[in-house]
Structure formats: structure tokens, C-alpha cells
């Protein structure tokens, strides 16, 4: 396989991965389901649901929102790492 072909294949796979990540939806919760967030594979926050009973403790609610978003971002990172390993395997590179 020549280098130019390998580079073209890598670019196509990267574009495919970017499209896949943009379409991906990752969900995470905090506080036993009190806060529920959804982010895209690009880490864009697209929804937050909060149990109305949580409004009585704003400081805790704020912490739960941050925790849920951070967990969602961690899950995106894990998904991306898995996708990258699959891509490397598809290209015949060591994982």
C-alpha cells in the first residue's frame, strides 16, 4: 500500500468518525437520577432534565449538574477512544 493511499484512507476514516461523533448521543445522570443530561459526541450539551424536588437545595443541584455533564463528557471520551481503536484496526495498525 502506498503512503498517499494510506493518507487518503485515514482522512476518509477521520471524516466518518467526525460525522459519527456528531450524531452520537451520550446520556449521564447524577444524584440517583435527579439530574439527567444528554450531550452529542462533540460534547455539545443538548438537554438537561432536573427533578423538580431538587430545587430546594440549589448548591447540591449545581454540583449534580456539573457532575452529570462531566460524566457525559468522560463517556464521550471513552466512546471516541473505542472508535479510534476500531479505526486503527481497520487500517491494519496496532491497537
Predicted features along the sequence, with ranges:
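Long amphipathic alpha-helical segments used for membrane anchoring, targeting, substrate engagement
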Residues: 1-27, 74-95
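Residues at the start of alpha-helices and the adjacent loop-to-helix junctions
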Residues: 1-2, 60, 64
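Residue-level signature of catalytic and energy-coupling elements of molecular machines
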Residues: 10, 43, 65
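N-terminal intrinsically disordered, cationic/polar leader segments
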Residues: 23-25, 29-49
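Short beta-strands and strand-coil junctions in structured, solvent-facing domains, enriched
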Residues: 34-36, 55, 73
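Alpha-helix boundary/capping detector
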Residues: 36-39, 43, 71, 91, ...
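A short interface-forming secondary-structure element
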Residues: 44-61
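Stable alpha-helical structural segments in soluble proteins, enriched in small hydrophobic residues
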Residues: 64, 68-76
